[in-house]
């Protein structure tokens, strides 16, 4: 079923993980996900390896099972140390703990930065000029702008779509 997302994922993964660790079952699971993976870490276990991958969601490939998690389900992350023999702790909101403790390949810190919970910070528009763009003074607007910014940073919308959807930007000439 190989698609362009798979090809990009494969190129990114091969830069980090030696080919002898890439099993056919893992590659098939990545292909079937339809996702374009951006990060991977490999946790060395006694009975094989666990693979943690991320893009818009994050995935765990363990014992030939490919499990997807939403980043919104992450309650907390903790970076213990980097590779080799790296360790991170990912705690989900349902209480489940993912604890890769012998990370041999990949960038552990970058991985948890991608999956850690991101709090929408309320944009403060207290210093706006009176009479200019009154929607900036509306607290509901600030939350919407933060939501738009998050969508753009997560890759769901382009910066052009962000500009179009942001009522604070003038639309003259559009």
Swiss-Prot record:
It comes from the Bacteria. Keywords: Histidine metabolism. InterPro entries: HdcB. One of its GO terms (biological process) is L-histidine metabolic process. Pfam families: HdcB (PF17528). This is Protein HdcB. It comes from Lactobacillus sp. (strain 30a).
